[in-house]
From Swiss-Prot:
Phylogenetic classification of the source organism: Bacteria, Pseudomonadati, Pseudomonadota, Alphaproteobacteria, Hyphomicrobiales
Compartment(s) where it occurs, according to its Swiss-Prot or TrEMBL record: Cytoplasm
Gene3D superfamilies for the chain: FAD/NAD(P)-binding domain (3.50.50.60), GidA associated domain, C-terminal subdomain (1.10.150.570), tRNA uridine 5-carboxymethylaminomethyl modification enzyme MnmG/GidA (1.10.10.1800)
Function: NAD-binding protein involved in the addition of a carboxymethylaminomethyl (cmnm) group at the wobble position (U34) of certain tRNAs, forming tRNA-cmnm(5)s(2)U34.
Pfam family for this entry, one: GIDA
Protein name from the UniProt record: tRNA uridine 5-carboxymethylaminomethyl modification enzyme MnmG
NAD in keyword set: yes
Swiss-Prot/TrEMBL keywords: Cytoplasm, FAD, Flavoprotein, NAD, tRNA processing
Species of origin: Allorhizobium ampelinum (strain ATCC BAA-846 / DSM 112012 / S4)
């Protein structure tokens, strides 16, 4: 009798690790199937976590009890808060990470979870019965039954590495691709596409002349990702900065016909916001140089990652142009750069739970959905893991709104618009970024996590204490009032208009802090620094939030107006045949998604609302 699981996760990358951990936290009997146990949690490309938009996702994962934030804190060796001089809404926490420490941190959690079993193997096929996935079939013929399956294949689906004219079937360097699953997905009639990403060469740091380079230090006060991290204990390092030169550009231009991207050898589309050095030279040829960050990959590792210079040129050309960069005149390349193509599905095939609309029981997360980046993959893995476990347990799935989280923004973008290139998160993608800040991810999402049961007891207790302190402080500041003269007497300048202001109103002034107010109310001196910062940010944005809250409420109303799954759009009179076909193809779950269908007009939405209001939609039978 084969072992039976509630949830099987295919793949042990960032999406798979987060999915397996989320499922196991909910108590589901979870199995993670991966080619090699020792590669779970590996950082396949850049040795960094977070950044603009991406750091918000990591904070949200942590607020829901996930892995990535804690593991990044355990492995971080150069913490920097990006956009520090700008408003809190667009600040992005980031760290360079020690690859070995990060992998160990992920594995320490997963290997020791009682609800999680890890199996080494190659999933060759899915067991599908009557339109429902019932488990997986391994390449050795073994069948593993389960209630839900999560596919997190990364770049492994028909993965093909390109170095110049050389092609190597692989999911990443040294690991075989997954061929059977691509065939299965195609056989099931899913819309597949081809995308491309790339990674730069790895350099031997002992052969770099660091004395020539500008050095970038870590922040003096590291800002952790995880709510549960009190302080960063790793030694913090510097990274070097160099630039391409005219000689670099000449070599690349002279050999660009040998690039896999420019020879027509690659059919997949690459990420717009992480272009190869060939793209940079072709598209921005008038620049005198392009910045390259030399990022050490570990505290006891001499490998260096040259961020900003990915390529698919031949190895000989890579060596030639690399040595034209200042500081790299004698550099040794440890691993050549390469581009990799892989299959993905059209994410419009998915519901907001990340389950396939036409194949129940199968959830997808990560690069298979058309995204790029560790953080985007991990966030999807978390959602898929929670929903697969809840479905297996007979519970309703959970949806994350774009008004509630960057996770919701990303998923809504994917399932509403699909992708024509690898999708990357930016703060500019969110309409409600004043309220979707990295600093308040816990306040937005941890209560949801507590209700779902995916928050550990120590995190729940700490969060409730933290929220209680913030609420008490805000309430206190709302009850304390000052006249302009009283404020001026303690060095707090305000307009001399005679109006009494609350302490919270005063705190909204850009030059007034909790420390200033503590001259009047010394009890504020005792506030925890995180609580004080949270209260200051709350005061800063409070005046802007009324209008945004009204917009958020309108968005939520549209998201809450569900459209029956079996609605026959052909019967909806008043719409063009083209729009009916698009609605039939995308099958939006609610009004918010329907409004994003290409060609949808305000008149068409009004017609759909009228049908909903009049009860003319055919009910699910």
């Amino acid at each position: 009798m084969p072992r039976r699981f509630d949830v099987i996760v295919i793949g042990g990358g960032h999406a798979g690790s987060e999915a397996a951990y989320a499922s196991a936290r909910l108590g589901a009997r979870t199995c993670l199937v991966t080619h090699r146990r020792d590669t779970i949690g590996v950082m396949s490309c850049n040795p960094a976590i977070g950044g603009l938009g991406k750091g918000h996702l990591v904070r949200e994962i942590d607020a829901l009890g996930g892995l990535m934030g804690r593991c990044a804190d355990a492995a971080g060796i150069q913490f920097r808060l990006l956009n520090r001089k700008k408003g809190p809404a667009v600040r992005g926490p980031r760290t360079q990470a020690d690859r070995k420490l990060y992998r160990q941190a992920v594995q320490n959690v997963l290997f020791n979870h009682p609800q999680l079993e890890i199996i080494e193997g190659d999933v060759f096929d899915l067991n599908v019965e009557n339109g429902t996935v019932k488990g997986v079939i391994l390449a050795d013929g073994q069948s593993l039954p389960s209630a839900s399956v999560i596919l997190t294949s990364g770049t492994f689906l028909r993965g093909l590495i390109h170095i110049g004219q050389t092609k190597i079937p692989a999911g990443r360097v040294g690991e075989a691709p997954s061929l059977g699953l691509s065939a299965t997905l195609g056989r099931l009639g899913l819309r597949l596409g081809r995308l491309k990403t790339g990674t730069p060469a790895r350099l031997d740091g002992r052969t770099i002349d660091w004395a020539q380079l500008e050095m970038q230090a870590a922040d003096e006060q590291p800002v952790p990702f995880s709510f549960m991290t009190d302080r960063i204990t790793n030694r913090q390092i510097e990274c070097g900065i160099t630039r391409t030169t005219a000689a670099t550009h000449t070599i690349i231009r002279d050999n660009i016909h040998l690039s896999a991207m420019y020879s027509g050898q690659i059919e997949g589309v690459g990420p717009r916001y992480c272009p190869s050095i060939e793209d940079k030279i072709s598209r921005f040829g008038d620049r005198d140089g392009h910045q390259v960050f030399l990022e050490p990959e570990g505290l006891d590792d001499h490998t260096v990652y040259p961020n900003g210079i990915s390529t698919s040129l031949p190895e000989s050309v890579q060596k030639e142009f690399m040595r034209t960069l200042p500081g790299l005149e004698n550099v040794t390349i440890l691993q050549s750069a390469y581009a990799i193509e892989y299959d993905h599905i059209d994410p419009r095939e998915l519901s907001a739970s990340l389950e396939l609309k036409r194949l129940s029981g199968l959830y997808l997360a990560g690069q298979i959905n058309g995204t790029t980046g560790y953080e985007e993959a991990a966030a999807q893995g978390l959602v898929a893991g929670l929903n697969a476990a809840r479905t297996a347990g007979g519970q309703d799935v959970v949806h994350f709104s774009r008004a509630q989280s960057y996770i919701g923004v990303m998923i809504d973008d994917l399932i509403s618009h699909g992708v024509t290139e690898p999708y990357r998160m930016f703060t500019s993608r969110a309409e409600f970024r004043l309220s979707l800040r990295a600093d308040n991810a816990d306040m937005r999402l941890t209560p949801i996590g507590i209700a779902l049961g995916c928050i550990a007891s120590d995190q729940e207790k700490r969060f409730k204490d933290y929220r209680h302190q913030i609420d008490d402080t805000i309430n206190m500041l709302e009850t304390r009032k000052l006249t302009p003269n009283e404020a001026a007497a303690v060095g707090i300048p305000v307009n001399q208009d005679g109006r009494r202001r609350t302490a919270l109103e005063l705190l909204a002034y850009p030059d007034i802090s909790i420390a200033d107010l503590s001259r009047l109310w010394p009890e504020l001196d005792a506030l925890d620094s995180k609580v004080a910062e949270a209260v200051e940010i709350h005061a800063t944005y409070a005046v802007y939030m009324d209008r945004q809250n009204a917009d958020i409420a309108a968005t939520k109303r549209d998201e809450d107006r569900l459209i029956p799954k079996d609605f026959d759009y052909a019967s909806l009179s008043g719409l063009s045949n083209e729009l009916k076909q698009k609605l039939e193809k995308t099958r939006p779950e609610n009004l918010s998604q329907a409004a994003k269908v290409e060609g949808m007009t305000p008149a068409a939405i009004s017609l759909l609302i009228a049908f909903l209001n009049k009860g003319m939609l055919r009910h699910v039978g």
